[in-house]
Curated annotation (Swiss-Prot):
Promotes transcriptional elongation by Su(Tpl)/ELL. Essential for development. One of its GO terms (molecular function) is transcription elongation factor activity. Residues 119-220, 250-360, 372-503 are annotated as: Disordered. Residues 202-215, 308-337, 406-437, 454-472, 487-497 have a biased composition (Low complexity). The modification Phosphoserine is found at S196. The keyword Transcription regulation applies. This is Ell-associated factor Eaf.
Length: 503
């Protein structure tokens, strides 16, 4: 049935009748045949410009590469069309040949199956792009073939003349690929973020400086001392610091002496320890000059101008007077000393006070004896002169002489009294300055050898001497003469003597 259908279809197509015909085997079935072969060629595209009147050429190269050249018509402008492809052998395929003249049908074996494609620029570009895309590069490659000649690269196994062109084009593409890859890497390195570790570790780039908010302000902890006044720290071995500080304290000494302070205060050994803050004085808000007594064992006693951490100090006459008033009116307070050397100064001051008190007591006793002798002499002279007629005038003269003598004695008495008062006033100021010092010292202060009881006894002795001196000075009149009681007694004696003369 199938043969009938095939014959029917074949008979219809070849216009052969339904009669039976003889089938012959061709020369290809003969094993000794070497001259006859049948091949099939399959084209992908057949242009209309192909000239069928002329013969085409088939070139079989190595590795089963086949090039087919088909001539074109002269009117097309292109001499021929080139096809390239490959071939493979047939195994069981046959070819039936029908001869219209004789009506004989011959069967022949097929040898090779050839499949070719037209060599176009587009096709060649696609064939070249495939290896380029595998390499990561898609740049187009221009072929040298334009249809008039064979294209250099499209089908493997082509002629030896076109093979070097394929290799050269491939090498050019690989070179361009390497250059583009390097440029991309350079761009990636150039556009890295600022915080990238590769950029920070790169030797070619400068190391970025990270500014924190703590270092942004202009105020710096290290530079903060530059705005403060220079406050030298004085120790036991720092003799040069004391000498340098003496120049800064010259103005304070002159202002203190101009305000009426004794010279002993201006030349006393007092220095201010650095890093000491000033406490507010009694709530009145005025700045008060603070001194601290210091006696290093190997350094001379000098005075240093105090500085209060950047506050301006304007030492004038009015300020010195206010300073003295505050020191006089402030209650005495016991302050620890900054060094242990104050014991020597306190003992020296107590010895000086004892010697002064003894000298004053001796002067007072001698003065009392002189006063007693003068009084007894005046009374005896007044009694002896009462019998004379001129006793009144003589007594008046003697009284005046006695007054002048007594005035001289009073002057002699007032001189040690003034010396004692000056010394006492100096001791009070030194003691007051010692008490008005700040308690919070950063140099390891120790308490003095004498206690509060010794200070109280010292103050009581000073008060007793002052009271005695006031009593002794109160005996005399304000004009330096004898008191009113002695004058009245003298007048009574003179009047009695005059009455006796009249009788």
């Amino acid at each position: 049935m199938m043969m009938t259908k095939q014959k029917n279809s074949l008979a219809e197509r070849l216009n052969i009748g339904e009669e039976a015909r003889e089938l012959k085997l061709g020369a290809t079935f003969n094993p000794k045949n070497t001259s006859t072969a049948f091949h099939t060629i399959k084209y992908d595209f057949k242009p209309a410009s192909v000239d069928t009147s002329r013969m085409a050429s088939v070139d079989v190269g190595s590795n089963n590469q086949v090039t087919v050249t088909v001539p074109n018509s002269e009117s097309s402008g292109v001499p021929h069309t080139v096809y390239k492809g490959n071939q493979r052998e047939y195994a069981k395929e046959c070819l039936m040949i029908y001869d219209k003249e004789t009506g004989a049908i011959t069967i022949e074996k097929l040898n090779h199956n050839i499949q070719v494609k037209k060599t176009r620029n587009e096709v060649s570009n696609k064939s070249v792009q495939l290896p380029g895309q595998n390499m990561g590069q898609g740049q187009p490659h221009n072929q040298g073939a334009n249809g008039a000649g064979p294209a250099p690269t499209s089908v493997p196994g082509q002629g030896s003349g076109t093979a070097p062109k394929m290799e050269n084009s491939t090498m050019r593409i690989s070179t361009k690929t390497k250059v583009s890859t390097g440029s991309r890497r350079n761009n990636i390195i150039d556009f890295k973020p600022r915080n990238s570790p590769m950029q920070q570790n790169s030797p070619s780039r400068p190391v970025p400086v990270h500014r924190s908010p703590q270092s942004a302000p202009a105020w710096d902890a290290n530079n903060a001392q530059q705005t403060l006044p220079s406050i030298p720290l004085i120790t036991d071995d720092d003799d040069f610091g004391l000498r340098a500080a003496l120049h800064n304290s010259g103005h304070a000494n002159r202002s203190g002496s101009a305000a009426g302070q004794p010279d002993f205060v201006s030349t006393s050994s007092s220095t201010h320890i650095g890093k000491q803050r000033q406490a507010p004085p009694h709530g009145h808000g005025k700045r008060q000059q603070m001194h601290q007594r210091l006696s290093p064992p190997m350094a001379q006693q000098q005075q240093q101008h105090p500085s209060n951490y950047g506050r301006g100090y304007n030492g004038g006459h009015n300020h010195a007077q206010q300073q003295q008033q505050q020191q006089r009116n402030s209650p005495p307070r016991q302050r620890p000393s900054a060094y242990g050397h104050d014991n020597t100064m306190d003992v020296d001051s107590s010895r000086e006070h004892e010697l002064t008190s003894q000298s004053v007591a001796q002067a007072a006793a001698a003065l009392e004896q002189q006063i007693g002798g003068v009084l007894s002499a005046s009374s005896s002279s007044s009694e002896s002169d009462s019998s004379d007629s001129d006793s009144g005038s003589d007594s008046d003269d003697s009284t005046e002489d006695d007054r002048s003598t007594q005035g001289q004695q009073q002057d002699h008495q007032q001189q040690p009294h003034q010396v004692y008062q000056n010394h006492n006033h100096t001791q009070q100021q030194v003691t007051q300055q010692h008490h008005n010092q700040l308690p919070n010292l950063g140099l390891g202060s120790i308490s003095p050898a004498y206690g509060s009881n010794h200070q109280q006894q010292h103050q009581q002795q000073m008060l007793q001497h002052q009271q005695k001196q006031k009593q002794q000075s109160g005996i005399y009149a304000s004009n330096g003469g004898f008191p009113n009681d002695f004058l009245q007694n003298d007048l009574q004696l003179s009047s009695n003597s005059s009455d006796d003369d009249d009788d």
